[in-house]
Amino acid sequence: MPKRVLTGRVVSDKMDKTVTVLVERRVMHPLYKKFIRRSKKYAAHDEGNVCAMGDLVRIEECPPISKRKAWLVTARNGEPVGAAAEAQGA
């Protein structure tokens, strides 16, 4: 099964090696057929502490890193980050 990949905005970078990413999605209301915005926050691993508040990031599912972290930041503002950048360069 492929790893899930989500795109969202960094809303907190206060933790060491961790960022909080807000992912928004649009869902149609079953009765009124109007699109509603739903959002969820994910704790994602940021090894180099390179992400800042407001950055647009891509996160990828990974094995659990801690109790709440099971996502890894793979790209920041369209540029690969960390292990993803090394794999792409090699």
UniProtKB/Swiss-Prot annotation:
InterPro entries: NA-bd_OB-fold, Ribosomal_uS17, Ribosomal_uS17_bact/chlr. Pfam families: Ribosomal_S17. The keyword Nucleotide-binding does not apply. The keyword Ribosomal protein applies. SUPFAM superfamilies: Nucleic acid-binding proteins. One of the primary rRNA binding proteins, it binds specifically to the 5'-end of 16S ribosomal RNA. Part of the 30S ribosomal subunit. This is Small ribosomal subunit protein uS17. It comes from Acidiphilium cryptum (strain JF-5).
